């Protein structure tokens, strides 16, 4: 769960039990160095060693989990800390040494990226899950419409812009649309926001976007040029960057480029056979017609790919899925959580088969 959350930028605070403080380090019965084990799959992990620090640590944990690139935090509670009594102190705010949330953008780098966008003949915006995490969807839509630039998404980025929007091409990558992948291959500028460029999107790195200059905007410094070496790296929250870009935005002439992308889509569209009885694609079509404004949740498997290919999303709907790790078993608990958090919304869950519940 923790590894999935760190890949998909899901805020999570885990509380684990530990042997009493005096026994730590003695190989006591059921002692596990859970902090050490999870250090590489959490943003922060800590053992509470003084009950008086508990409130401060919990405050820190939720702040770290939610800010920057969201992710998991682990708090390890020794048994004697759990059973200790005394007044609880929960501070209004905490200062965390060495932890800084970047709420700015390097305007010079952003201007450089924008100039490249203006001069490009075949520009393409690649929107990743970072758009949905930052809730920058409206900002992205405004920028896309102002610039008149086509958009492709990753699986985790689906819904970053309404799927029925005329400038939306589709998902790219291993399970993406032909037109979206062709556009990535032929574009001369790939303007990427909130994506890690993982292998399911890029395939062979030597063949990925071979004709394009690449701009990469991401809140996580470690993601920049990790998989794909980019021409203009920009460390910034998606909303912060898009706010500034929207101040500069003005329409581009991309009619011929859009016409070419449409031709590719007509050449190899997503199919839907209707001569063999009920198909999974027809089920997705039925969901689109009857469950608008819903939260769609999938488990992991081929049914997940059908959902990412055929579900229609707009500003009032959402897709929850395990993209970075492909965690089977994710669907049911995620759907339960989605319903608890949104009791007035329909939640549609797609499972591998009906035996999971």
Describe every region a protein language model picked out.
Residues 38, 245, 257-264, 307:
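Generic structural signal of hydrophobic/aromatic residues within well-ordered alpha-helices
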Residues 262-344:
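Active-site diphosphate/adenylate-binding microenvironment
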Residues 349:
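Short beta-strand-to-loop acidic/aromatic patch adjacent to the donor-nucleotide binding site
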